[in-house]
Amino acid sequence: MKAILGLSTTQVGVRFLTTNDAVEGAEMLDKHRYCQALMRARHGQNVVLDAKGISCPAAARAFGFRPLPESLRTGKGLVGFGIVSEEKVAEEMFKKMPHLEMGAIQQIHLFPLEKAEQLPDLVVVEDEVEKLIWIILAYMHAQGGERVQSNTAVLQATCVDSTVIPYLEKRLNFSFGCYGCRDATDMAPGEAVLGFPASFLPDIIEHLDYLNKKALPHSRGKHAFAALKKELEGEQTAHAHRYEAGL
């Protein structure tokens, strides 16, 4: 996948662990948001995040580590951040937030997929939008052409949109990012994020190989745009010649 699409960083494997057993070779993170743990994994690091180490209260609730603090549950927090102007809007956003049951998992293991020693539950990819569309197309092919839906609140893009939703609903979901992950990580303006159950990976890779034979390089070559540009330049040249001739 990385070679075909030219991903700038690696795709990330995510495992939900139901015990507190140490993960060999992985660094236990402290005072990290989930999006920051994902950032470190996409840059090649093998990391683990648990209830003690996760610093984002919204993500902590999403993974069933801790209840939402009162300020977020009532909506006051998002008003304070300047994200929404009405508490009832934020309250509704959190009320409808997909989440794991409290205590369902104990740890989250994130690692570069290319260095995987265990099968992940999920694969999360963060990169430029153009690169992600091919993954979505390959996934759609694996689903027999079924249109791909996205579920987002433009909040919790990595933890909920790209991890919890794919896990609970057993499908790909994508997001353009959110206030939190764009503030807390190196996510670039033109990047987005998606996640899908790892069981879909073989079919996605197979169709990416197929796309790479014709559709992908042809699209990136912008042949239709080049033809239009050439035609427009020809019209401009002809117009200039007529102007010079006094026609």
Spans of model-derived segments:
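Acidic, serine/proline-rich low-complexity intrinsically disordered regions
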Residues: 2-247
